[in-house]
Amino acid sequence: MEIQQTHRKINRPIISLALVGVLMGTELGANTPNDPIHSESRAFFTTVIIPAIVGGIATGAAVGTVSGLLSWGLKQAEQANKAPDKPDKVWRIQAGRGFDNFPHKQYDLYKSLLSSKIDGGWDWGNAARHYWVKDGQWNKLEVDMQNAVGTYNLSGLINFTGGDLDVNMQKATLRLGQFNGNSFTSFKDGANRTTRVNFDAKNILIDNFVEINNRVGSGAGRKASSTVLTLKSSEKITSRENAEISLYDGATLNLVSSSNQSVDLYGKVWMGRLQYVGAYLAPSYSTIDTSKVQGEMNFRHLAVGDQNAAQAGIIANKKTNIGTLDLWQSAGLSIITPPEGGYESKTKDNPQNNPKNDAQKTEIQPTQVIDGPFAGGKDTVVNIFHLNTKADGTLRAGGFKASLSTNAAHLHIGEGGVNLSNQASGRTLLVENLTGNITVEGTLRVNNQVGGAAIAGSSANFEFKAGEDTNNATATFNNDIHLGKAVNLRVDAHTANFNGNIYLGKSTNLRVNGHTAHFKNIDATKSDNGLNTSTLDFSGVTDKVNINKLTTAATNVNIKNFDIKELVVTTRVQSFGQYTIFGENIGDKSRIGVVSLQTGYSPAYSGGVTFKGGKKLVIDEIYHAPWNYFDARNVTDVEINKRILFGAPGNIAGKTGLMFNNLTLNSNASMDYGKDLDLTIQGHFTNNQGTMNLFVQDGRVATLNAGHQASMIFNNLVDSTTGFYKPLIKINNAQNLTKNKEHVLVKARNIDYNLVGVQGASYDNISASNTNLQEQFKERLALYNNNNRMDTCVVRKDNLNDIKACGMAIGNQSMVNNPENYKYLEGKAWKNTGINKTANNTTIAVNLGNNSTPTNSTTDTTNLPTNTTNNARFASYALIKNAPFAHSATPNLVAINQHDFGTIESVFELANRSSDIDTLYANSGAQGRDLLQTLLIDSHDAGYARTMIDATSANEITQQLNAATTTLNNIASLEHKTSGLQTLSLSNAMILNSRLVNLSRKHTNHIDSFAKRLQALKDQRFASLESAAEVLYQFAPKYEKPTNVWANAIGGTSLNNGSNASLYGTSAGVDAYLNGEVEAIVGGFGSYGYSSFSNQANSLNSGANNTNFGVYSRIFANQHEFDFEAQGALGSDQSSLNFKSALLQDLNQSYHYLAYSATTRASYGYDFAFFRNALVLKPSVGVSYNHLGSTNFKSNSNQVALSNGSSSQHLFNANANVEARYYYGDTSYFYMNAGVLQEFARFGSNNAVSLNTFKVNATRNPLNTHARVMMGGELQLAKEVFLNLGVVYLHNLISNASHFASNLGMRYSF
């Protein structure tokens, strides 16, 4: 019977359907009732899937095409299913002779084989022609073509309605749709039979459309039931770009490929197309099973749904790749990936476990095993380049939701990104990976626009959920995200990573739930107060939210625990207020790096940020600006670590710029302001060793008011530039203060003053003995005229500049012009009594009167302290305890002699440990002293140095300095830098010597081919030969197979003064024995070795990748042997210092450099042969040249950077050796070589290692003498394969360093 050969236009209405959306649910009825998607899924499962799955997945499984499907779903389907369809009649066709002869011939499959058993006719109800198995759709056709070869075309078999068709053509190629497409469908009747069509071929190529379970004709008559199409290939399944595969309601497509080649569907695959218009009103299902595809599964374009709530399922293999995925606005696609170990259930139904008991009246049925949901295996992946939704203008309350669900370990959406088509009433896209991770590389678009807005009156919603079942998955977005107006994004994951910037429009909601969230930059500045406010809802993050930069305007921020590197609060300088609200309790671990308040529009239209509540907020820096406020009054404590800088006042009615409950200025933090202070502190203010920088403007400075208590906490740290205590309050340009008026600096109900140690602990007894803390605080209240201290002057001996500076500070021109007249102040500290300071329980204030003038050496002065040790090498600075005006003038003034201030010696003196200075010099020398100065003083300050030496005894200090100096000497040594290369070279010397011994053999037992030896003697006389053995020896293995390829595993170690260096790697090469006019050995090699080093204290650790390459040769002249060798080496070293003591902790750092070497060697030896050349003794002498070097390096430390310039060295050596070789058999040997190597010349440069200004020069070693012994041998394993082993030991007779290396290798000769 002829079938249609002309292409027909498909003009029937089509829609999308799906099936497996619910297959990943936890259990029936367990989903959240308020979730419309899952609510619909439950109903859909019970009302549609269980009965309808019979015609799709279950029937496919019954014939083995979907084995391994979710077992619980399959079992449920089987419960609802009737018995499998049984054909009334089975027709069989077998391809006979001829079909197996022509592999390049093409056949028409229908005409050649099928037509005899397929009938066709007119379907009056549907007004169309259709085809069926001969004698009725309840029959089956089996086609046996398993021996057939060639290509078989099936084209135009349209409206094949059953029954079953099974074509076995395992050695042939099936080509579907050469001229026209094919349509496989079914008819629904009382039995609801399923049409099953199976093609088993070597290769399958789809050229034209394929329809599965489409209607026949108009569809007005009999409807389609269900159809399963199985395409099985042992090699390749491919569809062309114009070959569309359409799965209609009730369709299942099984793809089976047993090869590792991918299945490539370049044509569009459309799931859920419906047969007729009325079907748009009902759900639908369709399924693709790729679980039996061994290679990757590739869809170029996959569409799900058209104009209905289609549900589709893919039972996938390990890796599924989709180019473009189109989802209809209400469609859903579930991609189920195999669990670890595959789909096969670990538990099987076994009827034998439940035998029938005839004695019982009740019959016990077999146990049914139902598996629950599962996670995809760790290597399962779903890749989608571009995800897109399609929509129409249909209105529905709550809008429509499209969904993509999977259980893969990784769901990856590529650079094509995600597009959500939005229409009135709103659209939502849900992307969920129930058990694994989600990664989105591309952008999020609305209506194909980046930053596109939702349709007016609607919202566009993106939802991403990762690991909902496991609570341990990551959602990652690697591109910028632009959310336009009314576009919302929700992300649920254990860890959410946003590696691009996020830009929020008006009325936008960004919601994240999970354990932690990491953001780059978030810009929420486009929103306005009211309906246009944007929301950052991170309240569902249980641990911490990390944001690099957050910029807000009218923004609601719901966040509990955060670390924001920078918070920028802006009003966009518009004529309406913009207010940011942190609407959650922020707890006690939240932190902001920098708060930047940008200037508002006006007092009436300001901006600001408010915190609803919290226990503690730590801020590094705050920058205030007018008409923009920071209200943290509901946070119990706010701490400032670095800086508060005030701008001009904002004058906002009812709102002051910065508002706190309790505010703490931490150590090293500063607060800068002038005549106005836009600050409210309703609780306590604590200055914990910070600095309040006050700038005089218009003759005044502002007053800091604390609602309750103010605390001034200070220490005895000295300002290294002035010699004074570091001030807590510093008044700049104090000379401009209005005279004779009390200027209140701090006001509180109660002010307390506390003196603490450098590290915050209670200070020592010497300081605590002075109980007048208010007077001590006054020394931390400093007045400056430019950079010159006004309230106290210090004049050092022979220093007129100090007198001039004092005169400029107090406005005394005489002291500036004639400093010689005031030399009586040398060695004194003078107090300016014209300045009155107040520090009591409620007020801190200053009153600047007329500056006093020095008149003599005793009035208002005190002597600078002098050194009390026997050797007056250093000036001392100390706390003045018994000055003449100790409690009335300047108590506890720290005075110093500037030229020796800041030395490590002065710190020891202040600690009353002057004798330890001598110990330091005696045991560690000037180099140890300089190292201590660099680590403690130059890199920190005297206070830090004091803390370190207080915690360390003199003996510990010297021991640690000596260990550090030794380590730094080691670093500077070129011998250390090239140790890995030297060990690698030693290993190769052993291997090369073994190769030369092997190829120098002149002994053999190889006498098997005696006829060849006699042939070689033809026309010669024995008397004309030097030795008859020479003729026989020409048949030794080295002549028959003169070329060798060898490879060795090498290892070595070096021991030197407790340090340990090791190396392991491999070496390989090729060599040959040449027997022409010149008898010689030539070869080349290359090697790699990884070396590691650690010193005895484990404070220096190194790892290096080393390579070595070179050539070698030996020339024979009778018993004389001349050896030549040249090689080069390069090493890349990564080293680190790891000192465990606190004193040396600043030395801990890492660095990288390159080391290199070049070597040439030449030697001469003479062979003394015994026992027919079986034993050879060879003395030899030689010379060598070695060039060593290293590049410069600088460490990654910001505190004490270690650096070293490049180094280079040239070495000349002479050596003498004696070698014993023993040859046995035809190929085996053993040798031992012992000798002495002496350096006789060395010159080059070796730069010092530097720590800032501190330098360590490498120790210059004397010329070295080495003793060396090496031995090795070789055994034959197979005809051309040999095993060799060698060891070498090298000992430095000068430094007592030892080096050991060994090798194990193989050789192949040819």
From Swiss-Prot:
Residues 1038-1310 form the Autotransporter domain. GO terms for molecular function: toxin activity. Residues 1-30 form the signal peptide. The keyword Kinase does not apply. Residues 350-364 have a biased composition (Polar residues). One of its GO terms (cellular component) is extracellular region. Keywords: Cell outer membrane, Membrane, Periplasm, Secreted, Signal, Toxin, Transmembrane, Transmembrane beta strand, Virulence. Residues 339-364 are annotated as: Disordered. The keyword Oxidoreductase does not apply. Induces vacuolation of eukaryotic cells. Causes ulceration and gastric lesions. The signal peptide, cleaved at the inner membrane, guides the autotransporter protein to the periplasmic space. Then, insertion of the C-terminal translocator domain in the outer membrane forms a hydrophilic pore for the translocation of the passenger domain to the bacterial cell surface, with subsequent cleavage. This is Vacuolating cytotoxin autotransporter. The lineage of its organism: Bacteria, Pseudomonadati, Campylobacterota, Epsilonproteobacteria, Campylobacterales.
